[in-house]
Regions:
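Common nucleic-acid-contacting/processivity interface regions adjacent to the catalytic cores
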Residues: 135-282, 377-431, 449, 458-460, ...
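Catalytic palm subdomain of template-directed nucleic-acid polymerases
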Residues: 455-486
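Active-site palm subdomain of RNA-directed nucleic acid polymerases
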Residues: 127, 425-452
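Short glycine-rich phosphate-binding loop at a beta-alpha junction
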Residues: 35-43, 448
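Catalytic nucleotidyl-transfer cores of nucleotide-processing enzymes
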Residues: 77-91, 105, 213-407, 528-552, ...
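Glycine- and acidic
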Residues: 8-13, 31-36, 138-144, 175, ...
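C-terminal, non-catalytic extensions of nucleic-acid polymerases
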Residues: 483-735
Length: 735
């Protein structure tokens, strides 16, 4: 004890206790003045562990000291990664798991969410390293044990100081009048914001609708994603619509209280069912459709197509599509028609569009104040946090109201947003092609790709003759100026289009606005949702500075996928950059050959594929019961690791549990009959028994390298196979 006291003196604010009872008692006294308790994975570990120790060492009654008003922590079982876990909710005292906050607000998947990995990524600082088990560290090096625990706490404090996620949650809670814990979701926050706006206007909120027994929630048609013109394209420009879905809601004044009627989707349902019978997916059924079939009939003023309109007063009327067009577009009613066939009124402003408008204006004002702060960093941070809350509110509203659990859920509104958005984006692409190539066509020669709220185009091919003759100047600057003019012309067309397509008054139609986003020297388009461009101008800000050609924007590629090792991600990123710089086939293939040699020289365990081992408990139990159960390959590989740990008597390596991130390695033929084995990403010391396994380097090269190279540049048709180096002599003697 004397040695421990001397060691403790080396550290500030560190208390030494002889008994756990005294330590827990002091902890309970300290937290009395704490508003928020936090930790890293504290929901699943620290909270249940601490409650359990207090119950065991002190008493069950002492757990009340974690709560207010003499209440005990309330037990809660939740499922995570396929396994039930125990936690406790502290009554009156707020607990926020910093790991869950980090996952929620970083919007990116990481190879590891271990505190050590996140500390290194965000702070360039890691946990204290030690050998052996934590129990051995406690017994044999108490000074390092103290340092280890202090560093964990320091990392948490530094992460919050930098990221301010608890502050952000607090700001969201206050602005939307919800509990801090409620901010971990999106639906309840949005719902309460709508309720608050309703009450602010002196109105009442309608009762919650409940689903009838046996009633199933039907999916809504999603955004339109065009099939790209595959391959390399020069001089790419992109135009995108500002906040498409919130703007659509505002433009058509969409709210439960402004719905006048709905065209019964008889034809649409029949067409979707026909597609399903033809083995098409729901998304494929809508692939080339830019509105419900009934909406298209109305816009075509088809006299021979009969439709039924269900009015909100519970009456229905049968008429021709042409008659409804006349009622809405040529009548005196203040009605608008969405691409879903939903009729909205604009006689008064609906709650949800009004709220979106206010949030949008408030965010603009906050951003202005942030810019006006000058060198006042404290004031800048204050306004930055507040504008970020508005951004989160704006981005989450559409998803929340389309969630069946939301009080304001209405499928008619949800599908009106997506289908109307499709029509607007189709018009944008058509108008771009009209300006560039002379004809109004969303699949025209200048259109390279389109996705949800954006269109990618190139005027280079269309204008090549004029460029060669010197009629049209073609430099980086002139292309920026040209593409800005194209975007301006497109933007100026929305007001009249909105009136023509949906009967919106001009004041509402002008809500839809687009701007030129990128100008890129080259782009590689592979398939839907998978493309990359090397841009040198983004919204007027140049990226080709400091000797760089520009910056890459890559979507849906293996460059950032969590199932791709980091060193392979880096290689693929370099490879893509070469392609977008215009390097020829020979140079790119040489780069691949060099990396293959490097890949082959790596240890076998570094060539595996990252995965997440969900439902380990479930599949382990099934295996024990049935002898051999069906399961995903990476789960069996994880199970093989756990078995080998036991077989080799390995007490130091960590087991693979539910939700663990793992690296899956393929194996050659072996006495155990294993085709693969995994190991935990967070395992800092690979055991010797594992290193001696017969790893199948060729098989892993095919999975982790060949397949991903093909995914990236296979569309170019280059001879990548020529870069493969195999030992032909050894192959001859394989049986």
């Amino acid at each position: 004890m004397a040695d421990a006291k001397e060691l403790t003196k080396r550290f500030d604010n560190t208390m030494l206790f002889e008994k756990e009872k005294d330590m827990l008692d002091a902890f309970l006294e300290l937290v009395q003045d704490a508003d928020i308790l936090s930790g890293w994975n504290s929901e699943g570990y620290d909270i249940p562990y601490t409650v359990g120790r207090i119950q065991k060492v002190l008493s069950s009654d002492d757990t009340r000291r974690l709560c207010f008003w003499g209440e005990k922590p309330r037990k809660r079982v939740f499922e995570k990664y396929g396994r039930e876990q125990l936690s406790f909710d502290l009554v009156g005292r707020v607990h926020l798991d910093l790991l869950e906050l980090y996952r929620k607000y970083t919007y990116e998947e990481r190879h590891s969410f271990r505190l050590d990995a996140i500390g290194e990524h965000e702070l360039d600082e890691r946990k204290t390293v030690y050998e052996g088990s934590l129990d051995n560290l406690y017994k044999n090096d108490f000074g390092l044990f103290i340092e280890y625990n202090r560093q964990d706490t320091a990392l948490l404090a530094k992460l919050e100081k930098k990221l301010k996620f608890i502050e952000l949650a607090n700001e969201i809670a206050h602005q939307n009048t919800v509990l801090l814990q409620t901010t971990m979701g999106a639906v309840a926050v949005t719902e309460q914001a709508i309720v608050n706006e309703t009450h602010r206007r002196g109105m009442q909120v309608p009762g919650r609708k409940y689903k009838k027994d046996g009633e199933e929630n039907q999916p809504a048609a999603g955004a339109h994603v065009a099939t790209p013109q595959k391959g390399i394209h020069d001089w790419i420009g992109s135009v995108d619509i500002n906040s498409l879905y919130p703007s659509v809601i505002r433009a058509l004044n969409m709210g439960p209280e402004t719905i006048v009627g709905q065209i019964r989707p008889v034809i649409t349902s029949a067409e979707i069912n026909r597609a399903k019978h033809a083995k098409k997916s729901f998304a494929a059924a809508w692939d080339s459709q830019f509105g419900s079939w009934e909406y298209q009939a109305v816009m075509n003023q088809e006299k021979g197509t009969g439709i039924i309109v269900d009015w909100e007063d519970k009456t229905s009327v049968r008429m021709s599509a042409a008659q409804l067009y006349e009622i809405i577009f040529d009548g005196n009613n203040k009605w608008m028609l969405s691409a879903n066939g939903t009729i909205f009124t604009y006689e008064y402003e609906a709650i949800i569009p009004g709220l979106l408008k206010r949030w949008y204006e408030e965010r603009q004002e906050m951003q202005r104040k942030m810019r006006d702060c000058g060198d006042n960093e404290i004031e800048r941070e204050y306004w930055d946090k507040r504008q970020l809350v508005k951004k989160i509110n704006l981005n989450s509203l559409y998803g929340a109201i389309l969630n069946p659990g939301c009080r304001f859920f209405d499928m008619r509104i949800g599908q009106s947003v997506t289908l109307t958005g499709r029509c607007i984006t189709k018009h944008m692409a058509s108008k771009v092609n009209e300006v560039v190539a002379g004809h109004y066509d969303h699949k025209g020669e200048s259109i390279v790709y389109g996705d949800t709220d954006s269109v990618y185009f190139s005027a280079y091919k269309t204008l090549q003759k004029e460029i060669k003759e010197g009629i049209i100047p073609w430099t980086k600057d002139s292309v920026v100026a040209l593409y800005d003019k194209i975007a301006d012309e497109v933007n100026g067309s929305f007001k009249s289009f909105m009136t023509k397509a949906f009967h919106t008054p001009s004041t509402r139609g002008e809500v839809i606005a687009a701007g030129r986003e990128l100008v890129a020297s080259k782009g590689l388009f592979i398939t839907k949702k998978r493309y990359a461009v090397l841009y040198y101008d983004k919204e007027g800000k140049r990226a080709d500075v400091d000797g760089k050609d520009g910056k890459m924007k890559a979507m849906g590629l293996d460059l950032k996928r969590s199932d791709t090792p980091v060193f392979v991600q880096d290689f693929l990123s370099d490879l893509l950059y070469m392609v977008l710089q215009g390097k020829d086939e020979k140079e790119v293939l040489e780069k691949i050959s060099e990396f293959r040699s490097e890949f082959k020289s790596r240890p076998g365990w570094e060539k595996g594929s990252p995965k997440r081992a969900n439902n380990m408990t479930k599949y382990t139990a099934a295996e024990e019961k049935a002898g051999r159960a069906n399961m995903p390959g990476h789960v069996r590989a994880s199970m093989n690791w756990n078995r080998c740990r036991e077989m080799y008597g390995d007490k130091y390596s960590m087991p693979i549990t539910d939700g663990a991130k793992v690296i899956v390695c393929k194996l050659k033929q072996n006495p155990l009959g294993y085709t693969s084995i995994a190991y935990p990403v967070d395992e800092m010391r690979i055991p010797e028994w594992f290193k001696e396994l017969p790893f199948d380097g060729d098989a892993m090269e095919a999975t982790i390298l060949d397949q991903k190279i093909d995914n990236l540049i296979g569309v170019l048709g280059w001879d990548v196979q020529s870069t493969e180096t195999t030992n032909t002599f050894n192959k001859l003697f394989e049986f």
